[in-house]
Structures are given as structure tokens and as C-alpha cells.
């Protein structure tokens, strides 16, 4: 798939802003809705909105393969020395937080499960799978197993407040003191459950047996 430059980045933001404008206008009353009727069609291109909204994740990819994996040509490899490579930055910083990542991945996967035909018809399935597979690859790399039992898992990579104090591109953030990996063997059951949910729905959607194996192990960890 062709990489996208700054122009597409601007268009993605514009599409999101247009949709926000449409939603906000709808709340302001029937009179305003009537005045918008003539131009509403120009905003309600939900096929394009779906496509552009997924570019958000290309912009937030982390790892030693970002240069080839991201759809944006202005993104490149970063944080290649992380103890757990890959995944996605949290929005607005360079930390990889487990809870929002797990929730996001499971929500993306469930959206595809519910509306598979729409993704297929719009040609967006391959992009969606690339994103959910990347999330799930990170969750599996973050999980240490003994047989089918989780012995420990990583629930965060990066130091929250210290990272928030640094303003730079991820490609130029080379201070390894900011890239601590946090592991646990008997805590963070909520995060383990989110990982499990994301892996389970990705297995349902795309059939990777390893996703199911890790989903079961993390689920069992989360309820023990």
C-alpha cells in the first residue's frame, strides 16, 4: 500500500473535524439541522472517515519496523532497544500503556467482528488486520509462558511522567532511562484481561491459533 505524506495527514484531520462539526450541529436544534441539510452530504462520507481514522494508529506505531509498517512516510523506526519491541505509543506521548492498548485492540477487533461486511466492501480489512495483529503481537511478546501458564507479563513500557516532560519525535527519543519495562507475576489482572479479550477476538476474526493460546493463558491469569 502506498505511504501517505503530510497532505494525507491534513486530510485525515479535516475529515475528523468535519464529522465533529456535523455531530455538534445535530445537537444545536432542528432549525440548524435544516440549514445544514444542503451541505451535510459533503461531510457524511463515512467510508472515507473509516479509512482515515485508522491512520491514527499508523501515526502512533512504535518499534524497529515502523519505517516499513506505517502507512505514513514521515514515520520511521523508533525505540528499537525496548525490552518489548513493537506495539503503539499512547496518544500524545511515547509510553506503551497496557490498559488503553488492550482496550483499543479489543474494541477495534469487535468493530470488525460486528461490521465485517462493511470493512470488506470498503477494502479496509487488510489495514484493520495489520493493526490488530500488531497489537496482538505486542501482547504476546509481553507475556512469558510456562506451558499454558502465564509466569509474568509486561503491562507498561516507558516512564509516564518523565516521558511527558520530553517533547520530541519518537524517532529522536534515545534516552533509554525513559524506556523501562514494567513486569508483574501476580498483579494487573485488569490489563491481562484486556490483552486476553483483544487476542480472543483477533483469533475469532482471523484464526491465528497463537492468539487463542495466549488469550486463554492471560484470561486464566486474570481470574486467579
Predicted regions and their residues:
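Bacterial Sec-dependent N-terminal signal peptides
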Residues: 1-14
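Hydrophobic core
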Residues: 15-25
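Sec-dependent signal peptide cleavage junction
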Residues: 23-41
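Low-complexity, Ser/Thr/Pro/Gly-enriched N-terminal "stalk/linker" regions
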Residues: 37-99, 103, 133-184, 188, ...
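Well-ordered alpha-helical scaffold segments within catalytic/enzyme domains
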Residues: 42, 55-58, 63, 105-122, ...
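Conserved, well-structured interaction surfaces
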Residues: 92-99, 110-125, 185
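Acidic/aromatic-lined carbohydrate-recognition and catalytic surfaces
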Residues: 119-128, 147-154, 188, 195
Amino acid at each position: 500500500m502506498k505511504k501517505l505524506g503530510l497532505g494525507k495527514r491534513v486530510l485525515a484531520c479535516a475529515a475528523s473535524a468535519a464529522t465533529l462539526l456535523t455531530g455538534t450541529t445535530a445537537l444545536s436544534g432542528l432549525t440548524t439541522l435544516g440549514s445544514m441539510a444542503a451541505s451535510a452530504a459533503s461531510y457524511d462520507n463515512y467510508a472515507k472517515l473509516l479509512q482515515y481514522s485508522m491512520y491514527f494508529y499508523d501515526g502512533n506505531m512504535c518499534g524497529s519496523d515502523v519505517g516499513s509498517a506505517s502507512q505514513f512516510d514521515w514515520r520511521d523506526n523508533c525505540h528499537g532497544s525496548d525490552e518489548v519491541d513493537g506495539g503503539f505509543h499512547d496518544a500524545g506521548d511515547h509510553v506503551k500503556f497496557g490498559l488503553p492498548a488492550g482496550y483499543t485492540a479489543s474494541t477495534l477487533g469487535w468493530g470488525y467482528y460486528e461490521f465485517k461486511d462493511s470493512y470488506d466492501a470498503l477494502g479496509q480489512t487488510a489495514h484493520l488486520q495489520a493493526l490488530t495483529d500488531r497489537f496482538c503481537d505486542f501482547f504476546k511478546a509481553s507475556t512469558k509462558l510456562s506451558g499454558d501458564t502465564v509466569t509474568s507479563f509486561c503491562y507498561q513500557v516507558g516512564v509516564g511522567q518523565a516521558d511527558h516532560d520530553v517533547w520530541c519525535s519518537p524517532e529522536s527519543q534515545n534516552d533509554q532511562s525513559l524506556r523501562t519495562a514494567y513486569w508483574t507475576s501476580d498483579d494487573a489482572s485488569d490489563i491481562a484481561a484486556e490483552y486476553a479479550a483483544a487476542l480472543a477476538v483477533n483469533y475469532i476474526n482471523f484464526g491465528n491459533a497463537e492468539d487463542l493460546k495466549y488469550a486463554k493463558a492471560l484470561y486464566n491469569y486474570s481470574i486467579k
